[in-house]
Structure formats: structure tokens, C-alpha cells
């Protein structure tokens, strides 16, 4: 523009042109930085995912500012051709002015444009309400983070309590045989009686505690995402029904666990049950679990409730053992050998690279029967061999319930996932909520509900606190809202410094709530 209106050499025009736009450019740069920088202070597990955004964006804006003041003027000097003074823009300005008057004119003119302005405001309000209602009408799925396309899945299997390790391994092999038929699966590894190698997701879900014969994991590796047409989430949805059929046949429960795109949670949908009595909490959780199962599209339902199972306790008759001259340590050692075995000596082989232990134990089919165990003999002080059945008696008990705690409060967890048309845990959470709230409890009263924090008095009555992906969503939007509030204050101060006015920045920033 300056070149077209003046015959001054381009090298002399460029500094004035840069000075003309320099102030607004600097203001815009630091305004963007002020808007993004508070995101670096988002707390919780979402913080590490958010912090690169303000850092990288701020660096990009500063680099962009340097390019605007250094590189762009130099390129303009090298590439632009000198132009003589003229009035080439008058016609363009006339067309632009005509367009401006045609669009803006009806809204100006004081009282004359009042009806048009009211129509504009009403239209904007209707559009805002329509946009907000899209999530409520389920035309747009409200979800914290989209599904990622990872190259792995994890199958978590829980067999009935007391299932032998061999049976668990057999079920995993049956599932593995099916997984081998899936085109996108390159390989898999089954782990019976223990957990797969712990990843970040497993660390939060405490998979390291999965050490029992009835527990199993299958680590499934998929082809590279560039070598397959289906997303990993689509594959997970496709393999779940056949795997669930195998699990139901063996009385097992199954979870298809995907690597989350953001911070991991215990489960996408988590209900924490609090109350004055743990037995009552378990009863409430069992009813809640039934509501989870009955809700449409809710899968992978589980609860932190141990199955009722018998337990056998072996007690030593101390008086009789002392009378026969048998040490209690010898009795315990014999029982340990029968149940778990013991390495008694290494096998000496000249060609062996590592020590080969010689293990003494009962055959597996006998180790599982207490009668076989009690037929083992220990040597008394006089040299006689005495069977354990004369010194040990078995007590049949019920298995104790594991008591979980969170922030020192006893809690029972009920968890689930969403897999259906909506595929967002928030919709599943509110579907379950509509089924349980307002109904009387068998223990008396109604169930309390908390979304943000635990009950102030967890022993006053039974209540649930929603957790999982909802908690991450709430904390993220809470922190981001506070961060953008600070950002707006910084933007306001920058604009005040630019225009030397406290009112003009408010007018300039008025459209921000509409974005």
C-alpha cells in the first residue's frame, strides 16, 4: 500500500510499514502467549499432557514474531518490485466499502436498526443454545479424549475363585487360539497366575497385585497402524463378543483393556461406595453391579468384592506335638514342602550353564488334597515317623473379604466401560445414575451421591462417589477454566497498556465468551 501511494524507495518505506503494524503484532503475540501459558499449571495426571501445549506454542509465537520483524521485511525488500504512486486502491476501497455498508448497514442507524440488531442477537443466542444442546441430544458425543490407534491390547481374565492354574492356562490358550485368527494380530503372550508386564495403565490399575492361580492376562500385539485399515478400538470392539463367549462358557469375567490416549484411570466408569458398615457397602455394591450389567452398552463390569469361597486352616496341636517330641518348625516345613515344594540340592552337570535345582514336592493332583498332605510324616525326637494327621487338624472357614481403602476410608469399587453407539463413559454413568437414584435402600434411607469429592461424613449413610474418566474430565476443565480466567486477566492488562483505556479492552474482549 505504501509503495503504491508513494515514490519513496522501498528500503525507506519498509521501516515505517513495520512500525505501523509492529505494535499490534507484538500485542497479538503476547496475547496468545498469555492465553496459553496458564495451561502449564493444569494439575493432576492431565498436567503432563497439557504442559507441552503452552510451552511449544509460546516458543512458536516468539519465533513467529522474530520472523515478522526480521525475515519478512528482508524478503519484502528482495521480492517486491517498486511501484509508482497512484490511486490503484480507490476502486478496491470503493468495492470494499460498498460490501461493508451492505452487510453492516442494516444493524446501524440508531433506532432504525434496532429490529435488525435484536434479530441478530436472537439468532446468536439460538445458535449458542443449539450448539450446547448437541451433547444433551447425543448428536455430538461428549468425550474427554478421542480413541487412540495403538498397536496393542490387553485381555484381563478373572476365573472363579479357587480355579487351578492349569485350568486358567487352558482358558487363556483357548482365547489365544481365537486371537490368532484375527488378521491384525501379529502375536500374543498369555500369563496365567500372574500379570503381564506392567505399563502406565497397569500401574494405575494396580495390575501388579494380580498374583493368583485364577487370574490371567493376554498381551496382544497388533500390526503397525499403517499396515491395517481398522483402528485398534475397532479391533477391540470386534474381538470382545467372541472372547466374552469363551469366558462365559468357563464362568470367567473378562475385560478388553485398551491403552488410553490420555491419563489412565482405574476404569472409565467407577462408582465408589461408602457407608457406615462394610457388609452394607458390599450389599449396596452388589445391587449397583446388577444395575451396571442391566444398563445398555455397559461392558467389563466388575467389583472389588471377593467371591464367597471356603478356606482351610491347618492348626498344629501343640500339646500333642510337644508330647511326641516333634518341633513345630518341622511340621511347618513338611507342609510347605507338600504345598510349594523345596529345592533340596543342585543337580551337578558338567555341561550346565546354570544351576539346575532338585525340587521335592507332592504331585500336583495330590498337593490340592488335604488328605494327601496330612499323610506326610515327620520324625519325632525318638526317631519314629509320625503322620501329620496325628499332629495337625484342619478347620473349614469362610474366606475373609478384602477391605479396600481410599484416603483412609473403607470403600467398595464397582467399575465398567462403555462400548456401543455412543462409546463415551459419561453417557453410561448418567444412564446408571438414572436407574439407582431415588430408590430406597434395603438398609434404610436412600443412596447419597457425590461427583467431585468424597462424602464429608462417610459413616453417616451409604453414598456413592463417581470417579474414573468423569473425574479426569472435571479436574481438567476446572483447571483449564481457572487457567483461562487468569489468561483473560493478562490479556485485559495487555490491551489496557496498548490503548490506555479501561473500557476499550472490555469492548474488544466482549466476543471472547462466544468462541
Regions found by a protein language model. Give the residues of each.
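Helix-loop junctions and hydrophobic alpha-helical segments within the transmembrane domains
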Residues: 2-27, 97
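Surface-exposed amphipathic alpha-helical segments in non-transmembrane regions
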Residues: 112, 130-139, 154, 167-187, ...
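Transmembrane alpha-helices and their membrane-interface boundaries in multi-pass membrane transporters
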Residues: 1, 22-41, 48-90, 218, ...
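Loop-to-transmembrane-helix entry motif
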Residues: 17-28, 53-56, 60, 103-116, ...
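Signature of alpha-helical transmembrane segments and their immediate interfacial
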Residues: 19-21, 89-143
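Interfacial segments of transmembrane alpha-helices in multi-pass membrane proteins
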Residues: 37, 41-45, 347, 378, ...
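Hydrophobic alpha-helical segments of integral membrane proteins
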Residues: 10, 14, 46-49, 53, ...
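Short extracytoplasmic/periplasmic juxtamembrane "stem" segments immediately C-terminal to an N-terminal membrane anchor
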Residues: 147-162
Amino acid at each position: 500500500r505504501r509503495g503504491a501511494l508513494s515514490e519513496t524507495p522501498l528500503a525507506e518505506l519498509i521501516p515505517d510499514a513495520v512500525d505501523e503494524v509492529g505494535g499490534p503484532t507484538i500485542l497479538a503475540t503476547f496475547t496468545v502467549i498469555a492465553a496459553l501459558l496458564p495451561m502449564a499449571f493444569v494439575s493432576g495426571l492431565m498436567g503432563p499432557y497439557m504442559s507441552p501445549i503452552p510451552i511449544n506454542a509460546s516458543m512458536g509465537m516468539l519465533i513467529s514474531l522474530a520472523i515478522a520483524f526480521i525475515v519478512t521485511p528482508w524478503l519484502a525488500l528482495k521480492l517486491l518490485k517498486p511501484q509508482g504512486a497512484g490511486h490503484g486502491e480507490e476502486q478496491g476501497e470503493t468495492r470494499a466499502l460498498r460490501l461493508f455498508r451492505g452487510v453492516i448497514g442494516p444493524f446501524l442507524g440508531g433506532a432504525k436498526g434496532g429490529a435488525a440488531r435484536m434479530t441478530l442477537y436472537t439468532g446468536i443466542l439460538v445458535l449458542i443454545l443449539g450448539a450446547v444442546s448437541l451433547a444433551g441430544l447425543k448428536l455430538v458425543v461428549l468425550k474427554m479424549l478421542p480413541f487412540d490407534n495403538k498397536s496393542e491390547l490387553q485381555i484381563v481374565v478373572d476365573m472363579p475363585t479357587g480355579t487351578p492354574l492349569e485350568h486358567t492356562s487352558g482358558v487363556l490358550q483357548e482365547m489365544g487360539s481365537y486371537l490368532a485368527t484375527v488378521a491384525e494380530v501379529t502375536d500374543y503372550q498369555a500369563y496365567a497366575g500372574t500379570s503381564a508386564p506392567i505399563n502406565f495403565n497397569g500401574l494405575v490399575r494396580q495390575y501388579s497385585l494380580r498374583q493368583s492361580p485364577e487370574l490371567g492376562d493376554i498381551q496382544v500385539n497388533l500390526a503397525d497402524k499403517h499396515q491395517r485399515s481398522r483402528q485398534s478400538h475397532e479391533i477391540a470392539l470386534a474381538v470382545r463378543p467372541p472372547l466374552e463367549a469363551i469366558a462365559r462358557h468357563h464362568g470367567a469375567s473378562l475385560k478388553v483393556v485398551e491403552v488410553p490416549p490420555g491419563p489412565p484411570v482405574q476404569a472409565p466408569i467407577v462408582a465408589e461406595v461408602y457407608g457406615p458398615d462394610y457388609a452394607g457397602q458390599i450389599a449396596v455394591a452388589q445391587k449397583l453391579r446388577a444395575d451396571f450389567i442391566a444398563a445398555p452398552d455397559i461392558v467389563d463390569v466388575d467389583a472389588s468384592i471377593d467371591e464367597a469361597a471356603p478356606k482351610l486352616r491347618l492348626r498344629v496341636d501343640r500339646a500333642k506335638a510337644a508330647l511326641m517330641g516333634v518341633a513345630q518348625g518341622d511340621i511347618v516345613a513338611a507342609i510347605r514342602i507338600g504345598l510349594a515344594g523345596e529345592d533340596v540340592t543342585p543337580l551337578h552337570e558338567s555341561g550346565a550353564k546354570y544351576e539346575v535345582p532338585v525340587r521335592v514336592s507332592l504331585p500336583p493332583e495330590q498337593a490340592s488334597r488335604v488328605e494327601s498332605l496330612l499323610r506326610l510324616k515327620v520324625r519325632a525326637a525318638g526317631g519314629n515317623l509320625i503322620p501329620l494327621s496325628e499332629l495337625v487338624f484342619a478347620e473349614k472357614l469362610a474366606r475373609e473379604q478384602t477391605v479396600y481403602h481410599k484416603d483412609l476410608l473403607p470403600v467398595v469399587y464397582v467399575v465398567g466401560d462403555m462400548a456401543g453407539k455412543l462409546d463415551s463413559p459419561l453417557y453410561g454413568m448418567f444412564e446408571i445414575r438414572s436407574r439407582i437414584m431415588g430408590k430406597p435402600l434395603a438398609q434404610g434411607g436412600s443412596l447419597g451421591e457425590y461427583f467431585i469429592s468424597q462424602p464429608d461424613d462417610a459413616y453417616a449413610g451409604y453414598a456413592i462417589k463417581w470417579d474414573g474418566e468423569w473425574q479426569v474430565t472435571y479436574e481438567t476443565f476446572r483447571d483449564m477454566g481457572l487457567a483461562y480466567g487468569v489468561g483473560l486477566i493478562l490479556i485485559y492488562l495487555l490491551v489496557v497498556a496498548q490503548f490506555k483505556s479501561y473500557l476499550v479492552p472490555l469492548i474488544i474482549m466482549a466476543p471472547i465468551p462466544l468462541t
